[in-house]
Amino acid sequence: MYLSLLLILVSFFLLKGILQSDSKLKKYVILTTFYLNYFLLTVYVLFNFLSGDGINDAIIFHVKFGINGFGVNEYIIPSIIFIFFNLIAFSSSRIFLRNLTDQKTKLITNRTLSLTILVLSIIFNPFYKDIYELLSDRSNNYQVDKNSFYEQDIIFSDTRKNIVFIYLEQIERTYLNEDLFPNLLPNLKTLEKQSISFTNIDSPRATNWTIAGMAATQCGVPLLTPIASENSMSGMDKFLPLANCMGDILNEENYKLHYIGGSDLDFAGKGNFYKTHNFDSVEGWYELQNKIKDINYRSPWGVYDDELLDIVYDRIEILSKANENFGLFALTLDTHHPKGYISASCENKIYGDGTNSILNSIHCVDELIGKFMEKFLNSEIFNNTTLVLLSDHLALKNTASEVLKNANRSNLFMIFDKDAKPQLINDIGNSFDIGPTVMSFLGANTNGLGLGRNLITNESLSLDLNINEVIDANKRKILELWSFPKIDQGFSISIDQLKIFFGNRYINFPALIVLNSSNEVDQIMFDFYYANPLSNKVNRLNKNVNFIWLDKCEKIFVNKFINNNKNKGYCILLENKKNSQFEVIAAEENSINSAYLKNFFNNE
């Protein structure tokens, strides 16, 4: 990154001679290349600040799924800096070049040198490397192991237990290292002695952000999205609908399932994930407002952890009084990167000298969890309830990153079960292994789930294999878990809801439905305030690709060069490119039946 920036700046000083050329085309090409390379490097710097790992699956996922509910306050300053430096570079360059008088750059040797340095700055720009790795289909390099993806009929015993699953936001096991963070987590350190604690749980590719960690630990799969298709999942009605997750399995056993998280359910699609996988109650910031004492008492992300944990414990007590099994999954927030937040009940408690904000918040949450667990472990509820404390993922870039980066890092994973003997398990494992391992404590015969394995009875795939290569080998199968609605039965449109209904499935619109050679749904693309417009995506489709586009009529008319100013509503464009024909239909509460679609696309 720094080398690329240095080379860009050096090339900037050496380009004067070339830009004094009489060729306008040469000037535009050189300037465009320079600006684009600089801009993409600053994009990388911004995303690297957000993720701590450059442009990765987490960044791509949020670009595709949307950022509603995002804790934007934390990132205002980095975004302003990003915009500022790009404006400075753009506006100052003409002044700089106009006043640069070194005529030596006109020499051919210096021109060659300046172009060489510009090319090197492109080669060393980490933006391109990250994008290439994300776009490349690495599954072609591996022999697909059909036994990697574990699917089985799961049977529960008659003595099944309830389950409480508490994700501690970015509190990884590394923070228990007394050499690095002395007395940071005294309560968790004590609690570990009462648990089955797994000390070597890694985060594979596409699992190291919250919703990805949830999918990994509950479904045994990484959160891959079809990036190459420019697909956006924000308009989909289902979240990984074909994945078999803990919620689906427990629902089959008549568990009453609840999710409680302090943030907006729209952020990253968490609400959609839990609703898709059969949770009976799904509550985030807006749903919890009537349960908190002061609606103004909130962090940029949502409910503070002292209030959230009180709500969670109250819900456990209510559910335990019912004569049916339950599962409660919860997510804390205070320890969110980069700085964390402090609940009011911890205002006078700091860690060390108090200068490291994320460690202060972690120290606070440790105390809150200590009090929560003391109540739980001493209650009768514990007799028939297994409780899990775990990190949702490894910590992202925060105010303790300089210490963390030199550590042997692993996720927190502790199981509290009254009928199990406390122990440390040092076997190699990963996030996928958590779900099948936990369910075995509930009375299920889970040997595995997806790419995960039950660490009590089996070995993790990570033991003998590179788990990221296993992911790449199973990439196509994982992507198929998203599933698209089918158009073989036609569809109907609700203008009020901005939805297209395909039987019991739906998608939001505006939308572009791209069909494959069999005229089945291959991709669905949606419109965002920051996305490449659907009209551009239509124009970029291959000439033999059929599609259905539902959007504002004026956008479709402009695209098809139709002179019509009367219809201001929504329209449907059906285009059969193979036969060079199209049809525009007013979308007002319209229905398109299967016979019509078959006749149009298949000439039947």
Identify what each model region corresponds to:
Residues A212-L223, V403-T446:
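Substrate-binding rim/cap in mid-to-C-terminal beta-strand-loop elements of soluble/periplasmic
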Residues G340-E347, L359-F382, S410-F413:
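Active-site neighborhood of glycoside hydrolase catalytic domains
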Residues D248, D310, D314, H363, ...:
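Feature representing long, continuous alpha-helical segments
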Residues M1-S136, N599-E604:
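Transmembrane and membrane-interface helices of multi-pass
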